[in-house]
């Protein structure tokens, strides 16, 4: 992840020098995701908010703006900032017009619901299932692997170790098919702990 961070920061620097808006926005988006995966939720939130600013300024890609707003909320929740306007997040998901991010929207909302408190577990499960269905339908295999990994986390929280192992196993198989060796290694370690 550190290598990704380095190259994305360099890409952002070059885009800003060239005043290149499109690739700059994409680089900011991937940097927000990278920081999230690194567990640096404040930086992830900051970069998602920068993406929102860039997209609001250009008034292009409202569906991507919705995903960035959901991503920022997810980073806030993981940073223990629990006040989130769930209805606005649901509206962003409903208003999405890009099939390839349909599952990501649902997964992010599922992750928010799973981590905001203990009262939204069944809603989180519904949104994670929606993410799985969307990513299967749209053939977004890497994201499908992430969906199953999150589903495994939900079952761990519910105390269902068998279903947690089953879903983590599905995630690992998908990551193997994608050639995502780092993710295979990460989740194989998690699977060994669930034993």
PLM feature spans:
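Helix-coil-helix junctions within alpha-helical repeat/solenoid scaffolds
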Residues: 1-195
């Amino acid at each position: 992840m550190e290598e990704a961070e380095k190259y994305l920061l360099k890409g952002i620097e070059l885009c800003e020098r060239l005043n290149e808006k499109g690739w700059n926005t994409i680089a900011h988006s991937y940097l927000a995701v990278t920081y999230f995966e690194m567990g640096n939720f404040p930086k992830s939130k900051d970069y998602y908010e920068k993406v929102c600013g860039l997209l609001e300024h250009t008034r292009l890609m409202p569906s991507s703006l919705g995903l960035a707003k959901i991503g920022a909320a997810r980073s806030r929740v993981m940073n223990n900032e629990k006040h989130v306007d769930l209805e606005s997040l649901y509206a962003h998901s409903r208003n999405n017009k890009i099939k390839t991010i349909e599952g990501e929207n649902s997964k992010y909302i599922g992750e928010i619901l799973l981590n905001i408190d203990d009262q939204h577990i069944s809603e989180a499960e519904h949104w994670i299932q929606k993410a799985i269905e969307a990513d299967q339908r749209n053939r977004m295999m890497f994201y499908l692997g992430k969906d199953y990994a999150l589903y495994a986390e939900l079952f761990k929280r519910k105390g269902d170790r068998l279903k947690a192992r089953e879903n983590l196993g599905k995630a690992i198989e998908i990551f193997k098919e994608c050639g995502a060796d780092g993710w295979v290694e990460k989740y194989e370690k998690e699977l060994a702990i669930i034993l």
